[in-house]
Curated annotation (Swiss-Prot):
Belongs to the ammonia transporter channel (TC 1.A.11.2) family. InterPro entries: Ammonium/urea_transptr, Ammonium_transpt, Ammonium_transpt_CS, NH4_transpt_AmtB-like_dom, RhesusRHD. Involved in ammonium transport. Keywords: Ammonia transport, Membrane, Transmembrane, Transmembrane helix, Transport. The lineage of its organism: Eukaryota, Viridiplantae, Streptophyta, Embryophyta, Tracheophyta. It comes from Oryza sativa subsp. japonica (Rice). This is Ammonium transporter 2 member 3. NCBIfam families: amt. The keyword Transcription does not apply. The chain crosses the membrane at residues 32-52, 60-80, 136-156, 170-190, 199-219, 234-254, 270-290, 294-314, 318-338, 352-372, 408-428. It is found in: Membrane. It is a multi-pass membrane protein. GO terms for cellular component: plasma membrane.
Length: 497
């Protein structure tokens, strides 16, 4: 009797399920990538659009949305292999496309992660997960994209959108890929034993330092915006923050490239640290300001998530609580106390305080990972002999490596971001013109987030051709003009385009 024909998804030729493919691993990696994607879109898109002043809601959300889309195209064209391909330089991989079937359906591999001893003998093989390269490309894209989206938080409310469109692909290629290859792709920091489990340095320290540097070159918002920049929708801000928190399960849970024991520990530690940090930040707000702040709670949640990221799957859960407490207190101090006493921090207009929530928290997390990383779990993750926390035999050497790795990331991002922005500035202005800065979304995009307004911002219906068409549109325009002629302005007129 002939054996039954297997259904299409499991056809033997070509092998839809090769011997090396673990369907569980592949399913988890795709799910983790989706979780991280939801952090950016809609998570940070919603958070940015709601945490800013109403007149910048559309522009802020669009900056995040554009960064996400542009990153994907550049990533599959050249970026992925610059970060995770064959070694070109000690800090950079060879550029190449990730577009063809032959590459994408082959087993995932990070070739430069093979580690050799001083005698040239292979001590640990390259990283080779049990799923196709396409899954690796997708997951790493999501991490690259969220880095640029986080960076955008420093520049909201004044950067020329055309300059942002030019900046994002350049920064991805000449800054992000360097740090990613150096720490994750088998570059010199990886081989040296610097620990960055899921992006405390590659993503958060990079975005915080690059964002702060970019904010310096772009310049500050208008004085009126800096003095009064209250969120336009705190409830939506909480919703965006919630997506960010829950999506972090994929962020840190997908870092081992397998649903193994470190993935489970990472997801638990991530949530524990976030909760501890949120509570710590809230308590400090109550102690020093007499009342809890919802915005502060979201910032505390963020710093806890960032602080645990460099060591999420490598530390005890009690250490995750300590890291959460540190993540909720030291960035609070830098933002609330140090910021007011530093001339440089006062001068640079970092719109969403990305420097404090990501650079400070990421640096802190990397340092604490150098103290608390467990030998057994670190060996599972990095394959670099001797990589472990100072409290578990790593000594001061591991802490020194963590500090040196952070210094490299800081210096590279300052230099690369500066050079890129100065180059972009030769072609297109980095800042919006004064008229757009005063008006906001309507001048920058011809769109506004809400049909209702009442805080002094004005919707000029006569600028929109779509509102003039037909009898209904003409009536709306006439009504708006009547209000203006009566000296009442446009307030109270609801426009629906």
């Amino acid at each position: 009797m002939a054996s039954p024909t297997r259904p299409g998804p499991y056809m033997p030729r070509p092998p839809a399920v090769p011997e090396w493919l673990n369907t569980g691993d592949n399913g988890w990696q795709l799910a983790a990538a989706t979780f991280v994607g939801l952090q950016s879109m809609p998570g940070l898109v919603v958070l940015y659009g709601s945490i800013v002043k109403k007149k910048w809601a559309v522009n802020s959300a669009f900056m995040a949305l554009y960064a996400y889309a542009s990153t994907l195209i550049v990533w599959v064209l050249v970026g992925f292999r610059m970060a995770f391909g064959d070694r070109l330089l000690p800090f950079w991989g060879k550029a190449g496309a990730a577009l063809t079937e032959g590459f994408l359906v082959a087993r995932a591999s990070v070739p430069a992660t093979a580690h050799y001893g001083k005698d040239g003998a292979l001590e640990s093989p390259r990283t080779e997960p049990f799923y196709p390269e396409a899954s690796m490309v997708l997951f790493q894209f999501e991490l690259a994209a969220i880095t640029l989206v986080l960076l955008a938080g420093s520049l909201l409310g004044r950067m020329n959108i055309k300059a942002w469109m030019a900046f994002t692909p350049l920064w991805l290629l000449f800054s992000y890929t360097v740090c990613a290859f150096s720490l994750w792709g088998g570059g010199f920091l990886y081989q040296w034993g610097v620990i960055d489990y899921s992006g405390g340095y590659v993503i958060h320290l990079s975005s915080g330092i690059a964002g702060f540097t970019a904010a310096y070159w772009v310049g500050p918002r208008l004085k009126s915006d800096r003095e009064r920049f209250s969120p336009n929708n705190i409830l939506l801000m909480i919703a965006g923050g919630g997506l960010l928190w829950l999506g972090w399960a994929g962020f840190n849970g997908g870092a081992p490239y397998a649903p193994n024991i470190t993935a489970s520990i990472a997801v638990l530690n991530t949530n524990v640290s976030a909760a501890a940090s949120l509570l710590t930040w809230t308590c400090l707000d109550v102690i020093f300001f007499g009342k809890p702040s919802v915005i502060g709670a979201v910032q505390g949640m963020m710093t806890g998530l960032v602080c645990i990221t460099p060591g999420a799957g490598l530390v005890h859960t009690w250490a995750a609580i300590l890291m959460g407490i540190c993540g909720g207190s030291l960035p609070w101090f830098s933002m609330m106390i140090l910021h007011k006493r530093s001339a440089l921090l006062q001068k640079v207009d970092d719109t969403l305080a990305v420097f404090h929530t990501h650079a400070v928290a990421g640096l802190l997390g990397g340092f604490l990972t150098g103290l608390f990383a467990l030998p057994d779990l670190t060996a599972v993750h990095t394959h670099i002999p001797g990589a472990r926390g100072a409290f578990y035999g790593g000594g001061i050497a591991q802490v020194g490596k963590q500090i040196a790795g952070a210094l490299f990331v800081v210096v590279w991002n300052v230099v690369a971001t500066t050079v890129i922005l100065l180059g972009v500035g030769l072609v297109v202005p980095l800042r919006m013109p004064d008229e757009q800065l005063k008006i906001g979304d309507d001048a920058a995009h011809g769109e506004e987030a809400y049909a209702l307004w009442g805080d002094g911002e004005r919707f000029d219906v006569t600028r929109h051709e779509g509102a003039r068409g037909g009898a209904w549109g003409a009536a709306v325009v006439d009504e708006a003009m009547d209000h203006r002629l009566a000296g009442m302005g446009a307030r109270g007129v609801t426009i629906q385009l």
